[in-house]
Amino acid sequence: MPKRILQGVVVSDKQEKTIVVKVERRFTHPLLKKTVRRSKNYHAHDETKAFKIGDTVSIEETKPMSKLKRWIVLPAAQAQG
């Protein structure tokens, strides 16, 4: 099964080697037929501390690294390609 890749915005970089990424998804509400936005925060591993608040990043699913961390940040060159 392929690993999931999501794109989002960094909302926190205060932890050591960890960033919090807000990922937004859009879907059509089944009853109201209106586009709804929902967001979720993911803790991702950032080994180099290269990303700051407001940066757009791609994260990839990986094995659990801690209680909350199950994602790693993709390098900028790989994220765009």
Swiss-Prot record:
Naturally occurring in which organism (per UniProt): Methylocella silvestris (strain DSM 15510 / CIP 108128 / LMG 27833 / NCIMB 13906 / BL2)
Q: Describe its function.
A: One of the primary rRNA binding proteins, it binds specifically to the 5'-end of 16S ribosomal RNA.
Domain of life of the native organism: Bacteria
* Disulfide feature: none
- Which family does this protein fall into? Belongs to the universal ribosomal protein uS17 family.
GO cellular component terms listed in the entry, alphabetical order: cytosolic small ribosomal subunit
Signal peptide (residue range): none
The record ties this protein, via Gene3D superfamilies, to: Nucleic acid-binding proteins (2.40.50.140)
Give any single GO term for biological process: translation
In the UniProt record, does the keyword Ribosomal protein occur? yes
Task: List keywords of the entry alphabetically.
Answer: Ribonucleoprotein, Ribosomal protein, RNA-binding, rRNA-binding
UniProt xrefs under InterPro entries: NA-bd_OB-fold, Ribosomal_uS17, Ribosomal_uS17_bact/chlr
Q: What is this protein called?
A: Small ribosomal subunit protein uS17
Q: Name one GO molecular function term.
A: rRNA binding
One Pfam family, short name please? Ribosomal_S17
Assembly and partners? Part of the 30S ribosomal subunit.
